């Protein structure tokens, strides 16, 4: 019995390690997809943070993670860097963007913030953010990497001129938020499978 338990534990651990390795690969790959070739390092930068359904009254785990990704994605070489927080009141009374803005300030961020508070989908996040990012020389769309690439693809569809300014955010750190990474990779795989049908 003990031997069987050890074997089952080893199998479960191997499966979990394999799943995590797959999720890390998905994040690493998608963090490099749908980028532009015309960003200007040292110029004006807009970091677009895509929101996630949030009941409030404080930012939930996913939105806190996304804000942290947005903050660390800002370039110290940018002449100006603005955080563009996206998301309407989808899961509660307060827009996701406002919840994320509060959290960014709690983390000590004192720089400029622009809020997009009307959107209910990723496509709307991007469409509604366009006026807020149009003057930026470099644009970074961040979330978890498989979600961020969806946002970047929407920008390519809507405004290829702006999409050429897309640069990579810091959204694919090895070993970070493993449960969130696995969930995001599974959602991305299901979405891709549905699109193929």
Residue ranges and their predicted role:
Residues 192-197:
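Charged phosphate-binding loop/patch that engages nucleotide di/tri-phosphates or the phosphate backbone
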Residues 23-188:
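A structural signal for short, hydrophobic/glycine-enriched beta-strand patches
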Residues 1-26:
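Hydrophobic alpha-helical topogenic segments used for membrane insertion/localization
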């Amino acid at each position: 019995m003990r031997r069987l338990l050890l074997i089952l534990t080893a199998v479960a651990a191997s499966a979990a390690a394999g799943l995590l390795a797959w999720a890390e690969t998905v994040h690493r790959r998608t963090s490099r997809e749908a980028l532009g070739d015309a960003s200007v390092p040292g110029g004006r930068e807009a970091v677009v943070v895509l929101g996630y359904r949030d009941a409030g009254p404080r930012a939930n785990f996913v939105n806190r993670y996304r804000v942290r990704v947005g903050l660390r994605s800002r370039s110290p070489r940018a002449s100006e860097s603005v955080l563009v927080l996206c998301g309407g009141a989808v899961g509660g009374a307060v827009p996701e963007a406002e919840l994320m803005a509060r959290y960014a300030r709690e983390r000590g961020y004192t720089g400029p913030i622009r809020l997009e508070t009307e959107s209910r989908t990723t496509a709307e996040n991007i469409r509604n953010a366009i006026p807020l990012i149009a003057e930026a020389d470099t644009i970074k769309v961040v979330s978890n990497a498989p979600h961020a690439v969806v946002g970047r693809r929407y920008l390519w569809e809507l405004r290829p001129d702006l999409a050429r300014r897309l640069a990579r955010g810091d959204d694919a750190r090895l070993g970070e938020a493993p449960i969130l990474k696995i969930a995001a990779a599974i959602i991305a795989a299901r979405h891709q499978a549905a699109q193929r049908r």
